[in-house]
C-alpha cells in the first residue's frame, strides 16, 4: 500500500492514472479491481474491453498505441480469432489468427518508445516455423530490444494448464545486440497438480534468476554507456552450459530467429567408462559356468 507524506502529492495520479487493465472476462475484472483496492489503489482503470478487437481503436484510441511505460501480461494461450474483428493495426505487425502472437504485437504497439514489457508466452512463440512466428520474432530482434527470455518448467500453471512457457523481457524501440537466457527449472513449488511448497536447497531458482538478471543488466549498462569491456560480459554470461547465458543477436538471426533456450544451451554429458570387452566376456563365461553347475545340482536332486 502507498503511504507516507512523500507520496501524498501523487495520490491522485496513483489512484486514477497509473494502473490500467483490459479484459472481457467479468470475473477477472472483479478480481483485478479487488486486488487493486487491497493494495490501496481505489480508482484503477480496470476496463471491459477485448484488447485485440478493432473496437479498441474507437473506445480507447489514446491507450491502444504509444501509451504505456510498463506492461505486465499473461495473455490467453493458443486461441484463434476472426481477422475481420481484429485490430487491423495489430495485423499490420503480424498477419495471423493466433492470439499468442497477436497479443505480443498489441503490447508492442501499446508501449511508449522506451517502454518495457514482461509477457508470458507458450513455447511455440519461441520456435514456431510459420511465417507469422518468424515475422514477430524478427520484429522483436531487429526493431526492438529483446533483452531476456526466462524459460519456465511445464508445471508452473498446473492444475489449469501443463503447457511449457517462457517470459519475454523487451523494450520498445532500438535494436537487439544480445539476448539473455535463463533456464528456470524450479519455482519453489512441486510441478504436479498439487503445487505444494518445496523446502531445501535447489527447490527455487527464482532468487538466482533475479540476481543474475540484475547482474546482466548492470554489465550491459556499463558496456553500452561507459564503454565497458565486452570480455567481462563474455566471461560472466558466455558459458552456455550454465543456467544463465547470453546469445548474440546475429547468431539468433542466422537460426531463423529461433528463441528456444534448447537451441543455444549446451549440455555437457559425463563420459562413461566401460570395462574392456574381454573382461566383460570373461565375467559372463564365469557366470555361465556357475549357472550350469547349479543346473547339474538341481538335476541330481531330481
Give the label of every model feature segment.
Residues 53-54, 60-223, 230-302:
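A conserved structural/catalytic subdomain of Rossmann-like adenosyl-cofactor enzymes
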Residues 1-70, 78-80, 101, 122-123, ...:
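Conserved S-adenosyl-L-methionine
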Amino acid at each position: 500500500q502507498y503511504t507516507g507524506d512523500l507520496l501524498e502529492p501523487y495520490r491522485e495520479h496513483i489512484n486514477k492514472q497509473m494502473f490500467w487493465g483490459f479484459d472481457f472476462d467479468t470475473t477477472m475484472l472483479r478480481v483485478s479491481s479487488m486486488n487493486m483496492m487491497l493494495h490501496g489503489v481505489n480508482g484503477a482503470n480496470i476496463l471491459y474491453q477485448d484488447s485485440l478487437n478493432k473496437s479498441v481503436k474507437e473506445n480507447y484510441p489514446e491507450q491502444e498505441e504509444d501509451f504505456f511505460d510498463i506492461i505486465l501480461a499473461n495473455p490467453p494461450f493458443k486461441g484463434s480469432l476472426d481477422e475481420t474483428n481484429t485490430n487491423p493495426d495489430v495485423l499490420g505487425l503480424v498477419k495471423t489468427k493466433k492470439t499468442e502472437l497477436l497479443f505480443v504485437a498489441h503490447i508492442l504497439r501499446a508501449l511508449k518508445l522506451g517502454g518495457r514489457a514482461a509477457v508470458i508466452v507458450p513455447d511455440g512463440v519461441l520456435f514456431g516455423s510459420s511465417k507469422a512466428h518468424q515475422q514477430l520474432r524478427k520484429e522483436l530482434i531487429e526493431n526492438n530490444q529483446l533483452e531476456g527470455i526466462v524459460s519456465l518448467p511445464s508445471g508452473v500453471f498446473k492444475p489449469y494448464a501443463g503447457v511449457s512457457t517462457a517470459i519475454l523481457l523487451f523494450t520498445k524501440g532500438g535494436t537487439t545486440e544480445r539476448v539473455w537466457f535463463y533456464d528456470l527449472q524450479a519455482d519453489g513449488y512441486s510441478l504436479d497438480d498439487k503445487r505444494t511448497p518445496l523446502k531445501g536447497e535447489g527447490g527455487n531458482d527464482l532468487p538466482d534468476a533475479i540476481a543474475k538478471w540484475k547482474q546482466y543488466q548492470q554489465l550491459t549498462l556499463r558496456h553500452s554507456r561507459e564503454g565497458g569491456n565486452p570480455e567481462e560480459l563474455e566471461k560472466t554470461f558466455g558459458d552456455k552450459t550454465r543456467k544463465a547465458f547470453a546469445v548474440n543477436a546475429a547468431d539468433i538471426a542466422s537460426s531463423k530467429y529461433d528463441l528456444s533456450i534448447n537451441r543455444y544451451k549446451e549440455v555437457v554429458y559425463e563420459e562413461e567408462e566401460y570395462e574392456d570387452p574381454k573382461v566383460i566376456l570373461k565375467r559372463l563365461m564365469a557366470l555361465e559356468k556357475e549357472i550350469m553347475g547349479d543346473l547339474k545340482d538341481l538335476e541330481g536332486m531330481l
